[in-house]
């Protein structure tokens, strides 16, 4: 079993100011978005100009941060934040939701499109291929923080990783499983899936490769966005089987996690949209 290296979450500290790895992962994501966006402009595959891309980035950042935070509050810990509403503003303590961030960006795209006279679906198609590498960067941030670890796996599996930060969850899980209790006593922690790295590979690298290559040619309006929507939903749904469910929610109906249930509409809408927009080309 490999032990998580327990990186210092703070990259640089100057007096009271601290630059955290997690914040850096977001910054890197926005840099990659801009770099890829300019590549697409140069290739003639974008509705953006260099100036409008920079303008949209501001809208996108607001959508990611506000939507991601509100999504986490509403989808995952609503009762806690209802009791302590000021904690909503403590973003530095963590707590962001992709699905909330996605909805925030969709709203930003709609507002930006109205302002600049760009069709919503055309703008969605342009933005979709620029997003996955940013998601990959965010998952590396999760891994460095040692958060969002995976479910317990076999002690002899080559991918098995112990997360010192999960000791409380390890003890709770071992209380209901004699074999896990034996492992915990022997190794001090349970072997878990490094699910952050699975999500990095699936939602980040694989999704980027699929959407980027598909969008290198002109496609029917709405089809690229649908591919991203359905592709993310499928990859996230798969990865959630290895990810530890949130302790305050656990598994929901049909033994699925909140992340899986939030991904189901994305899968359905993505598949329906991909087929429907593709059929329009045939007519």
UniProtKB/Swiss-Prot annotation:
Top-level taxon of origin: Bacteria
Cell compartment(s), UniProt: Cell inner membrane
Keywords for the protein's UniProt record, in alphabetical order: Cell inner membrane, Cell membrane, Membrane, Transferase, Transmembrane, Transmembrane helix
Any one annotated GO CC term: plasma membrane
Topology with respect to the bilayer: Multi-pass membrane protein
InterPro entries to which the protein is assigned, alphabetical: Lgt
This protein's record includes keyword Nucleus: no
Entry-linked Pfam families: LGT
Transmembrane segments: 17-37, 56-76, 92-112, 117-137, 194-214, 222-242, 255-275
Ranges in coiled-coil conformation: none
GO terms classed as biological process: lipoprotein biosynthetic process
Enzyme Commission designation: 2.5.1.145
EC main group: transferase
Record: residues binding a 1,2-diacyl-sn-glycero-3-phospho-(1'-sn-glycerol): 139
Similarity remark: Belongs to the Lgt family.
Record-linked PANTHER family: PHOSPHATIDYLGLYCEROL--PROLIPOPROTEIN DIACYLGLYCERYL TRANSFERASE, PROLIPOPROTEIN DIACYLGLYCERYL TRANSFERASE
HAMAP family from the UniProt entry: Lgt (MF_01147)
Free-text function comment from the UniProt entry: Catalyzes the transfer of the diacylglyceryl group from phosphatidylglycerol to the sulfhydryl group of the N-terminal cysteine of a prolipoprotein, the first step in the formation of mature lipoproteins.
Annotated NCBIfam families: lgt
Name the record gives this protein: Phosphatidylglycerol--prolipoprotein diacylglyceryl transferase
């Amino acid at each position: 079993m490999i032990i998580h290296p327990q990186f210092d979450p703070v990259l640089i500290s100057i007096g009271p100011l601290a630059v955290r790895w997690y914040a850096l992962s977001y910054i890197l994501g926005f840099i990659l978005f801009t770099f890829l966006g300019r590549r697409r402009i140069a290739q003639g595959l974008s509705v953006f100009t260099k100036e409008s891309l920079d303008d949209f980035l501001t809208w996108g950042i607001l959508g990611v941060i506000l939507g991601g935070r509100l999504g986490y509050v509403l989808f995952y810990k609503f009762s806690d934040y209802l009791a302590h509403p000021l904690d909503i503003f403590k973003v530095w303590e963590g707590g962001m939701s992709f699905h909330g961030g996605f909805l925030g960006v969709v709203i930003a795209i709609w507002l930006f499109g109205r302002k600049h006279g760009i069709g919503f679906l055309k703008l969605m198609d342009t933005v979709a291929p620029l997003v996955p590498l940013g998601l990959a960067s965010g998952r590396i941030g999760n891994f460095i923080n040692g958060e969002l670890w995976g479910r317990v796996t076999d002690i002899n599996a080559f991918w098995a990783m112990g997360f010192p930060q999960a000791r409380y969850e390890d003890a709770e899980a071992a209380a209901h499983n004699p074999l896990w209790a034996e492992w915990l006593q022997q190794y001090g922690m349970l072997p878990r899936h490094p699910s952050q790295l699975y999500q990095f590979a699936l939602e980040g690298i694989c999704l980027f490769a699929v959407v980027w290559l598909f969008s290198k040619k002109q496609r029917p309006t709405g089809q690229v966005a649908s591919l991203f929507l359905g592709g993310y939903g499928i990859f996230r749904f798969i990865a959630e089987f290895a990810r530890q469910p949130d302790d305050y929610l656990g598994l929901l109906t049909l033994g699925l996690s909140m992340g899986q249930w939030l991904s189901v509409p994305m899968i359905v809408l993505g598949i329906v949209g991909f087929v429907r927009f593709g059929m329009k080309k045939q007519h």
